[in-house]
């Protein structure tokens, strides 16, 4: 009997251990490495460039998430660019006519991720110029709801070099950016000058204000500038202990802390409810005392 029982018990234990999915191999460590750019055509920062198609190649298969919500081209494109992915390549085809002597930026935000784990490339902006120079100034800040100071996501923030009051409704912005989930924006590729700063929900995608859209604006004119600065950079020996604290040189772009308060303009429709006049009675008003009876 013992010769039969023990082999039977052993077979049951083996079956249970094989049926337990948690006891198998875990497939190795999770990949947290973002995709890496290996080639860009035209090259990053190209000058005098007339090509309207940009190709970016990576070291692994990538995909683009929520392109219409995250990717924005500046100067603004009335006709949305074509964005395609093919294996390790992303291509952007600009359909609008390129302006002469203009710096173009394509802000991908965190839209580019690897195909398997979805690790984002990070805040990547591709830059080229149709002229001999590249404008490098930046303007940054936040857009909050005026009534509760909550961040506003997806607002279009733009600069106007035309300081006329009518430019906001009659012309598209010179340079644009889009707010992220924290309400933060960063307008890049700005040339030196004097600007008005606006933000709008831009429901129809024409980069100008239309009645009914949420808006925000700065009361003061903006003059972008930059200066050489340093910041502390911490190197960690592990997750707890600091190994080294060193100073790093960088270019500080200003202004970098602008605050715009977004609101919806109230335009209630007014109707005439009633008119009243006492019978056989009339009032006459004059701008100054009369010296004689008319």
Residue ranges of each PLM-predicted region?
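Positively charged n-region of N-terminal signal peptides that target proteins for export
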Residues: 1-5
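Bacterial N-terminal signal peptides
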Residues: 7-17
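Acidic, low-complexity Ser/Thr/Gly/Pro-rich repeat segments typical of extracellular/periplasmic
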Residues: 18-182, 186-189, 194-200, 212-220, ...
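Acidic carboxylate motifs that coordinate Ca2+ or other divalent cations, activating on Asp/Glu
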Residues: 206
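An amphipathic, aromatic/His-enriched active-site/gating alpha helix that lines ligand/cofactor pockets
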Residues: 209
């Amino acid at each position: 009997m013992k010769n039969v029982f023990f082999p039977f018990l052993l077979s049951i234990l083996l079956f249970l251990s094989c049926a337990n999915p948690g006891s198998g191999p875990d497939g190795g460590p999770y990949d947290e490495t973002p995709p890496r750019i290996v080639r860009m055509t035209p090259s990053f920062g190209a000058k005098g460039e007339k090509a309207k198609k940009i190709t970016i190649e990576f070291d692994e298969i990538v995909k683009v998430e929520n392109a219409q919500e995250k990717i924005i081209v500046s100067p603004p494109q009335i006709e949305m660019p074509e964005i395609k992915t093919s294996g390790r390549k992303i291509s952007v085809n600009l359909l609008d006519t390129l302006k002469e002597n203009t710096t173009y930026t394509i802000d991908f935000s965190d839209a580019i991720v690897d195909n398997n784990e979805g690790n984002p490339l990070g805040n990547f902006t591709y830059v080229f110029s149709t002229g001999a120079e590249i404008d490098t100034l930046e303007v940054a800040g936040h857009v909050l709801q005026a009534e509760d100071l909550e961040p506003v996501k997806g607002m279009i923030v733009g600069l106007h070099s035309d300081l006329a009051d009518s430019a906001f409704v009659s012309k598209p912005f010179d340079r644009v950016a889009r707010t992220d989930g924290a309400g933060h924006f960063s307008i890049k590729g700005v040339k030196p000058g004097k600007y008005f700063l606006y933000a709008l929900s831009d429901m129809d995608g024409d980069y100008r204000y239309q009645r009914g859209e949420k808006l925000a604006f700065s009361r003061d004119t903006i003059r972008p500038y930059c200066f050489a600065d340093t910041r502390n950079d911490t190197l960690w020996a592990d997750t707890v202990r600091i190994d080294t604290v060193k100073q790093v040189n960088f270019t500080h772009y200003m202004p970098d802390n602008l605050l715009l308060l977004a609101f919806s303009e109230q335009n209630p429709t007014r109707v005439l409810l009633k008119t009243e006049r006492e019978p056989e009675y009339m009032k006459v008003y004059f701008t100054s005392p009369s010296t004689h009876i008319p």
